[in-house]
Amino acid sequence: SALLQFDATGDERFLELGRSNTIERMASHVTHIGVHDHGFNNVSTYGNLRRLVLEGRLPRNEWELAFYELALKVSGAVQAARWGVTSDGTGYVCSFNGPHSLFCDTIRSMRALALSHRLGHRLQGENDLSISLLDRLVQHARTTAKYNVFYGEGRDTYDVWGRVAHEAVFNRNDGRFRTPATHQGYSAFSTWTRGLAWIMSGYTEELEFLDTIADADLDPLGGRADIEAMMLRAARASCDFYIENTPADGVPYWDTGAPGLAAMGDYLDRPADPYNDHEPVDSSAAAIACQGLLRLGRYLLDRGDPAGEQYRHAGLTVLRTLLREPYLATDPGHQGLLLHSVYHRPRGWDHIPPGRRIPCGEAVMWGDYHLVEAALYASRLAA
């Protein structure tokens, strides 16, 4: 968030904070072989620093730029090496749960592979096998779209257009898909809304990335038309589900199937209530989803599809809500920016204030980061 704060304000205190902490603390994340988070951790640090250099916001020092780019090359390759194979011949980047596990979140980490590929890097495997990071990105996107996103096609009793499963579980003996699952959501058959938001933002971002790739590079992977159609379908389905299952102000409750929602009447027809007694909202999900809606709206409008207006307006509605109380922190003593975020409701990791029955009033790092990122994105669209 510090680097984005500098981007937004020009306050060099935040630049120094972000740059020094990246250099001092992030090397272990570049080579971390046990997580699915490279796109979150490294693109938001080394990636933003590289972008600021290329935009002329920082003095151009070739060695400094090479340092950031080396980190991004390595990060994308390390992430791509955490690989599982399915029975249908495709693959996926495994979650930190293990080789059986595909998280919906990881679609946002594909930007680590995308940047590494754009920088001309490949993953070197056994016997010096040279592995395309673009190929692994597309395979992961296909597998996630097939097993984590639902399209109302009767895959199970609760299959509706745009539902998202947090996790897809595979049998590692033969690679066959076994079941949807969740860890931070309520049920495998409901939708954890932050996971939904990762799908929304991840696929729309990768659609933009495809615009930078030559047709010849996509032809061996199925071709541009097929790949774009797959990603656009997942993006539209998830964004439609978000709009349909979120209160009128654009801030969702933490899971669409959370049991306490049944006691809240027509909760979708009014603004979300972070101070209710039944289920918490997750403003961090809204901050992430906001960007997905705005990006999808722009993508469609740029192609002459008027349906993009609905998504653009929905994204602006979400952003307008988050930049006001009760979501925007106004107490100078509070360390966060975006209030009423949730980390892990099932495990009880979220603070419940005295006199309250549910978590409220706190911020999380990814909520703050994505709020600032969404605001910067919207300001660039308006420029």
Predicted regions and their residues:
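Glycan-recognition and catalytic cores of secretory/periplasmic carbohydrate-active enzymes
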Residues: 1-383
